[in-house]
A protein has these predicted regions:
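A short acidic-to-branched-hydrophobic micro-motif
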Residues: 59-85
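Signature of long, low-cysteine stretches enriched in small and polar/charged residues
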Residues: 87-131
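Short, solvent-exposed secondary-structure boundary motifs
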Residues: 39-55, 84-90, 112-118
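N-terminal targeting sequences that direct proteins away from the cytosol to non-cytosolic compartments
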Residues: 5-8, 13-60, 64-67, 129-132, ...
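N-terminal targeting leader peptides, primarily classical Sec-type signal peptides for secretion
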Residues: 4, 8-10, 101-106
Length: 162
């Protein structure tokens, strides 16, 4: 009888030692991965010492008598929404050139607009690393564009991510 009781107690203890499988259910709250921090933007701006800088939640706006330069970081995913934010136009209304290097997509575009002080030309670039849109825009008067073209080419060619 003692053997049977001892065997029964051992069986009772051993049944509680088995590993239980955990199953995911619809009601489970899964941890969403945290979005990585935005990368640092590198760009060479002309004449930085005389510019007025306005801080926005998304980036900086550099103001000069001849031009405005915007450097912003926006959420990635919807390029149309980013273009609408930057220049007020949808992708279908613009000619957007797309290239890629080092896992980063690069979108370049230009636009023209009537401003308060006459016609304006705008040029923009968006770098998309899959998490964020890193944006550079320049808007300047349409008059007298020949002498500043080299300067703007240097600004856009220097735009990169660290």
């Amino acid at each position: 009888m003692k053997k049977c009781v001892l065997l029964g107690v051992l069986l009772l203890f051993l049944t509680g030692c088995g590993s239980q499988e955990t199953f995911e259910t619809v009601a489970d709250v899964l941890d969403a991965p945290a979005a990585p921090q935005p990368r640092q933007i590198l760009v060479d701006l002309p004449g930085e010492e005389g510019q007025e800088v306005l801080e926005t939640p998304a980036g900086q706006l550099y103001l000069s008598e001849d031009y405005e330069i915007g450097v912003e970081v926006l959420s990635s995913g919807d390029l149309d929404a980013t273009l609408k934010t930057l220049c007020g136009r949808k992708r279908e209304e613009l000619t957007v050139m797309e290239t890629a290097a080092d896992g980063v997509k690069r979108y370049e575009f230009v636009w023209a607009a009537a401003g308060e002080n006459g016609d304006q030309l705008g040029r923009g670039m968006v770098l998309d690393d899959g998490n964020y849109h890193y944006c550079l825009t320049v808007q300047r008067p349409a008059e007298g564009t020949g002498d500043t073209q080299i300067v703007w080419s240097q600004v856009f060619s220097s735009f990169s991510l660290a």
